[in-house]
């Protein structure tokens, strides 16, 4: 019965209008890949590597490391300008922007680098969905609607992204010819997920089912 309920997934009303847009799956996939490429990029940057090795930054506080966490939600937003005549910045106002911020902050609690909302997961391609891991089903503050949250298991430890660096021209070329196959062929995506084994996923699914029940 539980499996049947899980299979009959409730579609988030927020994504219904987005799902009708042509090419939305590829668009959403590429947005997530953009985050993953940023994650790989900061671990491939020579200046950041030099900062990590600078004893002045780590003196008295232990090892110093530059890292990033990401949160993503899908929906509408209003763009506007804030600031003064001396400095103007763009800002985005929307409950979806707030949700993305909450996803990012919650990633610390779940011990992951990247967290995606159900709204994003429902828009991604079938191939991309096989790479996501369902972390939990939660009710976000200010809302009574339950929402599934997901992660893409990205880890930099034990990965030398410098060995798989590419020119800017090659990166642009690969981005323009996107296909869902990239999830199984891109060196960056494969390397940051190399710590995920079939055994881990099987054990996790058993534990996750018990947790959800």
Model-flagged regions — what are they?
Residues 40, 62, 67, 76-79, ...:
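Intrinsically disordered, glycine/charged-rich C-terminal tails and inter-domain linkers
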Residues 1-30, 41-95, 119-129, 143-148:
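Catalytic core of nucleotidyl cyclases, primarily class III adenylyl/guanylyl cyclases
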Residues 34, 38:
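Acidic, glycine-rich loop-and-strand cores that form catalytic or ligand-binding grooves
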């Amino acid at each position: 019965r539980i499996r049947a309920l899980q299979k009959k997934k409730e579609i988030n009303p927020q994504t219904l209008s987005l799902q009708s847009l042509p090419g939305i799956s590829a668009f959403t996939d590429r947005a997530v890949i953009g985050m993953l490429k940023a994650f790989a990029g900061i671990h491939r940057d020579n200046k950041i590597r030099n900062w990590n090795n600078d004893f002045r930054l780590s003196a008295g506080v232990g090892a110093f490391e530059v890292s990033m966490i990401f949160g993503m939600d899908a929906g509408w937003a209003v763009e506007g300008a804030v600031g003064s005549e001396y400095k103007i910045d763009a800002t985005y106002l929307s409950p979806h922007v707030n949700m993305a911020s909450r996803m990012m902050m919650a990633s610390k609690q779940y011990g992951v680098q990247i967290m995606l909302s159900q709204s994003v997961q429902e828009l991604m391609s079938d191939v991309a969905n096989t790479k996501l891991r369902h972390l939990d089903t939660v009710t976000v503050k200010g809302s009574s609607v339950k929402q599934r949250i997901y992660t893409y298991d990205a880890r930099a430890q034990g990965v030398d992204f410098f060995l798989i660096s590419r020119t800017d021209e090659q990166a642009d070329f690969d981005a323009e010819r996107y296909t869902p196959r990239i999830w199984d062929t891109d060196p960056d995506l494969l390397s940051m997920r190399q710590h995920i084994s079939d055994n881990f996923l099987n054990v996790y699914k058993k534990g996750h089912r018990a947790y959800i029940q």
